[in-house]
Amino acid sequence: MDKLVAINTLDKFSHQGRYVFHFNDLKNMFSDESERTLKASLKRLVDTNILTRATQGVYVYNRAPKDSFILEHITKTIRRGEYSYVSLESALSQYGVISQLPMDRLTVMTTGRGGEFKTPWGVIELTHTQRPVSDILNGTVETKSPIKFAKRETALRDLQRVGRNTHLIDTRELKNV
């Protein structure tokens, strides 16, 4: 793939606010390339700092303007087709229920597989939930983020369900739950 063709194609998507791509997205965007050629082209684009490999199979277009939700966009791309929402320590720190703010970590509940993904922007920690979709939708709110955000009581319940450490919880803030 020619570098200029790649930049022009990726620029079109970035103008629509899209800057995080799964390998399968790129395979569809550059369908004239064989998988082997595409992998070699992606390596060249990463080596020339046009793309950054966020995690296995997920790439971020460096020339695109980015919002403050890059980890959430990466999460959505990693677990496309699954329900995912910010919860646990990340949500509770936003609500002021726990005393420490996780600076380099995003904690997310997902109906997909759990796992930890180290990216150049921080760590994404995915924890599997078997909660029904209706419970997930009722226990979350829409924000400016590309993925939903747990309500305070949902995040607290998730923290207790998965057996996480609760010693950072500010009990004075729990009275509002």
Question: What do the PLM-derived regions correspond to, one by one?
Answer:
Residues D2-R79:
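Short beta-edge/loop segments at beta->alpha junctions of small alpha/beta modules
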